[in-house]
């Protein structure tokens, strides 16, 4: 049997430097003392403060003390090393945001949104990540308003942001791409310390993504462009895909996919004066409901999106600030794949109890049916609350260690 602890230090150093995820590096360093000594812990990313986005040529908040703080989150798939029973072989999805002030302390969030759930009493104060199989499925970046207005406007900026860090000898130079309130693309380059809003906009943009080292953006019609962060020029790489109401870009198995969400407007039932009220306040009395999805695969040489008719083992996840994918055989062995998970108006107001309720839905790509995840126990256990093998003291010991993340 090979003694892995005797691998050359230069080879271990090369392997450790190729691990982008801090969670992968934690598990690498926990193998043995020689691996631990060969790899330094990742330095936390510095706190980036960005000026406020311009609004039609001027700042929304003229006070220079107001701006954005950029934070990074990781979406993790956590599984037990050796499930006690077959039903425990499923994974648990969670989003973590590292505390910038307290090392190894993290905030636990819903993987598809920013919901922060109450921690159960039996949840360990310190979670030793070396006790589990941990895989990073995706990352996301969030722009938070800070200072003068604080939490009051925290939720005003809802658009997705993607970031590319440049290899500049530890200077942490980066480029950020997001969608301006006008629907145009906005770019921030750290060395310029300024925003640029790109005026090209045949249709408002729906999503942005970093794929294969390049920035991609798709508009509401499916027109897809690559954004050159040096010249700030856009290059058309795929013609429009008409039909749906909201487009999502997602990477899966090394390919870029386009997920097209179809919505339907439904009237909310009311008293006899309901019809008159609808005409007076149409937005208030209409409810958007997700009815179906279509999926396309990007073929760059043809500059087009090609229909995907079967997702096979794939499970696609559409979050508010990121998208990611996984295989059913890995994340949920007892279930089929070919599904799309999403945040949105799953059913009408009567089904959910309130017109504006939002919940987690799943679309079966083969049958075309949409269900609430909470009605499907086999899918619901992927999400909050944490599974028994997380909260069990037999697997999650309450002690402090370098491989631990404090929740």
Swiss-Prot record:
F-box domain boundaries: 2-50
Keywords: Nucleus, Ubl conjugation pathway
Record-linked InterPro entries: F-box-like_dom_sf, F-box_dom, KIB1-4_b-propeller, SCF_F-box_domain
Main location: nucleus
GO BP annotation list: protein ubiquitination
Gene3D superfamilies: 1.20.1280.50
GO cellular component: nucleus
Pathway where it operates: Protein modification; protein ubiquitination
UniProt-listed SMART domains: FBOX
Top-level division of the source organism's lineage: Eukaryota
Function: Component of SCF(ASK-cullin-F-box) E3 ubiquitin ligase complexes, which may mediate the ubiquitination and subsequent proteasomal degradation of target proteins.
Assembly and oligomerization: Part of a SCF (ASK-cullin-F-box) protein ligase complex. Interacts with SKP1A/ASK1.
Comment block on domains: The F-box is necessary for the interaction with ASK proteins.
Name assigned to this protein: F-box protein SKIP23
Organism for this UniProt entry: Arabidopsis thaliana
């Amino acid at each position: 049997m090979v003694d892995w602890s005797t691998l050359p230090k230069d080879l271990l150093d090369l392997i450790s430097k190729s691990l982008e995820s801090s969670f992968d590096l934690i598990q690498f360093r926990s193998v043995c003392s020689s691996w631990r000594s060969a790899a330094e812990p990742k330095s936390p990313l510095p706190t980036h403060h960005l000026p406020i986005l311009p609004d039609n040529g001027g700042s929304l908040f003229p006070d220079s003390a107001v701006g954005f703080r950029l934070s990074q989150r990781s979406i993790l798939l956590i599984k037990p090393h050796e499930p006690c029973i077959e039903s425990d072989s499923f994974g648990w999805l969670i989003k973590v945001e590292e505390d910038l002030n307290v090392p190894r302390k993290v905030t636990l969030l819903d993987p598809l949104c920013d919901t922060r759930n109450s921690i159960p009493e039996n949840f360990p104060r310190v979670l030793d990540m070396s006790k589990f199989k941990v895989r990073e499925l995706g990352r996301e970046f969030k722009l938070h308003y800070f200072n003068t207005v604080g939490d009051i406007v925290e939720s005003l900026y809802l658009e997705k942001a993607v970031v590319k860090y440049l290899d500049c000898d530890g200077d942490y130079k980066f480029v950020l791409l997001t969608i301006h309130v006008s629907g145009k693309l906005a770019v921030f380059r750290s060395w310029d310390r300024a925003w640029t809003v790109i005026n090209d906009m045949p249709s408002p943009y729906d999503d942005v993504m970093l794929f294969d080292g390049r920035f991609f953006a798709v508009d509401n019609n499916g027109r897809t462009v690559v954004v050159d962060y040096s010249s700030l020029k856009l290059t058309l790489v795929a013609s429009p895909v008409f039909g749906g109401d909201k487009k999502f870009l997602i990477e899966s198995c090394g390919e870029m996919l386009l997920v097209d969400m179809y919505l339907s407007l439904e009237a909310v039932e009311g008293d006899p004066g309901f019809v008159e009220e609808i005409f007076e306040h149409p937005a208030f009395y209409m409810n958007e409901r997700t009815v179906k999805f279509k999926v396309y695969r990007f073929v760059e040489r043809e500059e087009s999106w090609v229909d995907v008719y079967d997702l096979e083992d794939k499970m696609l996840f559409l979050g508010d600030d990121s998208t990611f994918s996984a295989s059913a055989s890995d994340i949920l062995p007892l279930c089929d794949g070919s599904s799309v998970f999403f945040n949105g108006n799953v059913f009408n107001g009567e089904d959910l109890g309130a017109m504006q309720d939002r919940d987690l839905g799943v679309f079966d790509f083969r049958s075309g049916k949409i269900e609430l995840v909470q009605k499907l126990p086999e899918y619901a256990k992927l999400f909050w609350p944490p599974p028994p093998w997380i909260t069990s003291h037999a697997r999650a010991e309450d002690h402090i260690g370098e491989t631990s993340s404090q929740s």
